[in-house]
Each structure stands twice: as structure tokens, then as C-alpha cells.
């Protein structure tokens, strides 16, 4: 009896994989995801990457996603980012700019484990740039990014769910990389 008890305690049990991805709908049931975040902006407009803050909001539109046999969902994601840039590419003297970015994307979420989810998103972002007035004596320089426009946006990301309603969120894409916290 003692030997049997020792064997039961000492012999490792077979680990069971997290079956979250194979359980459709086994993800947070939410009406909105709120994600405040820090932003690193793309460096293709200025000589260095930008930095700032922002927020995203996700509204689920398909609870069980496009693949009914796995745990996935689809949401519309939109938000606002304020990004500051230094060192304009078109001048050798110091200059800077601030950008307001308004992303709108379709986000496809995959809940791969109880504490981890990944996603891909694609859409557009509207932007408005404000270059410092001292850069061009109050005028918009030729080739200056101080304007309004629309460009494509795409990203992949992951969330570490450290509770049922809060997750650390990393998004890597164009035009920004963000690190924030998601609340459901």
C-alpha cells in the first residue's frame, strides 16, 4: 500500500494540453473591449520613430468567428493615437510633428489557450499631421507630412489574459506598434 501511494505521488501524470482553441465560444463574453496603450510610430515619415499614447475600442460582431469548429471571434476595432515625432527627414535642423491617427480595422481573434489569445487585423487609418510652425516659417514645406490622409493599416497581436477581464496586449503592425492593457 505504501509503495502504491509513493508511485502515485512520484510518477508524473500525463500533461493535458489546454483545449481552449477547440472550444468554440469559450472566450470572454463582452460587449466592448477598451484598450489604453503606449504607441511607437513608424519611422518612414520622420528620421526617427514616434512615440505617444492612444486607445482602441473593440466591438464584437461575430461571437464564434468565421471558423465554427474553433474558439475565435471577429470584432470591429477603432481608436485614436497621438504620436509625436522628432527629426524630420527633409531638414537637417531640429523639427518635430504631432500626428493624430484614427485606425478602423476588422480584428479576427483566436483564443488559443485560457490565458493567451492572438489576432490579426486589417483596415485603414485616417491621419492628420501637425508640423511645427518653426520648421518652414509658418508654411507647409514641399513634401511635408503636415496633411490629412488615409492609408492601409494591418497588424498582428497577442494578449496575455492575467484575469477574466484584463489582459496585457501587444500589437505589431503598420503604422504603429502598441503595448497596452485590454479591459472587457
What are these regions (language model features)?
Residues 6-15:
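C-terminal segment of classical bacterial N-terminal signal peptides
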Residues 16-63, 85, 173-175, 180-184:
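Short glycine/proline- and aromatic-enriched beta-strand/turn motifs that initiate or cap beta-hairpins
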Residues 30-32, 47-53, 72, 96-102, ...:
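Residues that define the transmembrane beta-barrel architecture of outer-membrane proteins
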Residues 36-40, 53-59, 80-82, 102-108, ...:
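Residues on the lipid-exposed face of transmembrane beta-strands in outer-membrane beta-barrel proteins
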Residues 42-46, 61-65, 84-90, 112, ...:
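Gram-negative outer-membrane beta-barrel proteins
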